[in-house]
């Protein structure tokens, strides 16, 4: 199987191995996705020229289209790191998590999601989430059990925990953006720059528009005196740093668990 014989919309062993490993991880940063791609070529088609990542993924997506599955690219809300996740397009509801969680666990996630969406900060405190345990559908759940389930959501990359508070992982945003828009139309927040769903971000104190932190960083990158893109009033928040993939490559360090990635590359 040489590179010259590969055609668009044809899944080779390289593509199949890549897809299988991405499914295992659920979501990966771009740096790890590129490493995974190189690994798959090394195993199955060592002499082939490695396709550009965008072309490689588009090829897979063209085959997956009929199955209503897609590899989607997004960015982390806190620092703008590119991520990729395998997304089920056939359903937009939380039911896509049903294979991994019981009914009462899914309802706990739904309660946590509501708190996160309704909050101004994009976070829901563990205390507030656990206080809703008595309202869950299905089998009764103790607070100690609920704490363990929340950690399971974190391990499966549906939630992120920071200092006792929870927010949505980039995987959850990629998978559930349409569901969130449809279910919480009055509470949902949209970024003024990229117009996609916003969970965490900054807002203008004058007109109220919101921006993702990475969008804030890029928009005000060269502005000595940042002003709101909507009302032109002074932007009072600290401007975050722009994620630099070049520096990331130089350091060779990713936030994700490299050991875990290597252990699953087989």
Swiss-Prot record:
Main location: nucleus
Disordered: annotated segments: 245-266
GO annotations of cellular component type: chromosome, telomeric region; nucleus; Smc5-Smc6 complex
GO biological process: DNA damage response; double-strand break repair via homologous recombination
UniProt-listed InterPro entries: Nse1, Nse1_RING_C4HC3-type, PE/DAG-bd, WH-like_DNA-bd_sf, Znf_RING, Znf_RING/FYVE/PHD
Coiled-coil spans in chain: none
Compartments, as annotated in UniProt: Nucleus; Chromosome, Telomere
Segments for region (Interaction with NSMCE3): 1-102
Alphabetized UniProt keyword annotations: Chromosome, DNA damage, DNA recombination, DNA repair, Metal-binding, Nucleus, Phosphoprotein, Telomere, Transferase, Ubl conjugation, Ubl conjugation pathway, Zinc, Zinc-finger
Post-translational modification: Ubiquitinated.
Catalytic activity: S-ubiquitinyl-[E2 ubiquitin-conjugating enzyme]-L-cysteine + [acceptor protein]-L-lysine = [E2 ubiquitin-conjugating enzyme]-L-cysteine + N(6)-ubiquitinyl-[acceptor protein]-L-lysine
Zinc finger regions, RING-type: 191-232
GO molecular function, a single term: ubiquitin protein ligase activity
Top EC class of this enzyme: transferase
EC number: 2.3.2.27
Gene3D superfamilies from the UniProt entry: 3.90.1150.220, Winged helix-like DNA-binding domain superfamily/Winged helix DNA-binding domain (1.10.10.10), Zinc/RING finger domain, C3HC4 (zinc finger) (3.30.40.10)
PTM-bearing positions, type Phosphoserine: 251
Pfam families cross-referenced by the UniProt entry: SMC_Nse1, zf-RING-like
UniProt similarity note: Belongs to the NSE1 family.
The protein's name in its UniProt record: Non-structural maintenance of chromosomes element 1 homolog
Source species of the chain: Pongo abelii (Sumatran orangutan)
